[in-house]
Amino acid sequence: QVISSAGQDNAELHLFSDFNKFYESPVYSSLDIIIECASKDAVREFSKRIIESKKDLLVLSVGGFSDQKFLSELQDLSIFNNAKIWIPTGAIAGLDSIRSVRKYLDSLTITTTKHPKSFAGAPYFKNSKIKLDDISKETVLFEGSAITAIELFPANVNVAVSIALAGIGLENTRVKIIADPMISVNKHEILCKGSFGEIHVIVQNIPSPTNPKTSYLASLSAIECLRGLCNENFRIGT
């Protein structure tokens, strides 16, 4: 049952945008599951309090789990408090397959292509010679590890952290980020190879109407994850 929710035009938005106020409210005490859709910094700041209050937590800003020490501590807390942490598939496909073959992976890469405006505000541009407004053709912004990518593009590549956690870790997962002014979708291309064979997934998502940094599919994935939790007697997928 949905006890309460807030959107941009919702009168209750002030309650949900101030975590301390929300944490002390009667609404919070009545909840079983908290859904995070704020930022990776919010995940690191508030997750432990949520788990310690014995609430389950569904996380969309998976980049908050790029700190392995923090994630391990949170997992220990969840066991102690009998609380669960859920990471939906998000704006990609194939996450269950990557989990299935994680012990047999040799390489795991993801190439993310978005319109330049999707990268507005990314810390990467503080020290880069590349200016978003000057990008007139497909431009590679970054190539490196998932752990570096999420720090430079915290609002754009949560999916890279998701596949890294499902697969061979953040240091070993390679990420390429491309800005393309001619593209109208958020494109993610995943390639993993190993003794099992190869998995090649391409997803082209419509950007969220209210936040072009992410994909509409990410919201739909969270909703489906929640729906699945409400019907644990029948499950499709790994």
Question: Regions from the language model: what does each represent?
Answer:
Residues 20-21, 62-66, 91:
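Short, acidic/turn-prone active-site loops that include or flank metal/cofactor-
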Residues 10-13, 54, 82, 172:
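A generic structural signal for alpha->beta connector loops
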Residues 41-48, 53, 62-84:
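Rossmann-fold NAD(P)-binding glycine/threonine-rich loop
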Residues 1-49:
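N-terminal glycine-/serine-/threonine-rich beta1-alpha1-beta2 phosphate-ribose binding loop
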Residues 86, 91-238:
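Active-site-lining helix/loop region of Rossmann-like oxidoreductase modules
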Residues 37-38, 60-61, 88:
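Structural motif
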Residues 7-12, 75-78, 103-106, 127:
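Short, hinge-like loop/turn segments at secondary-structure boundaries
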Residues 56-58:
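A short hydrophobic/small-residue beta-strand
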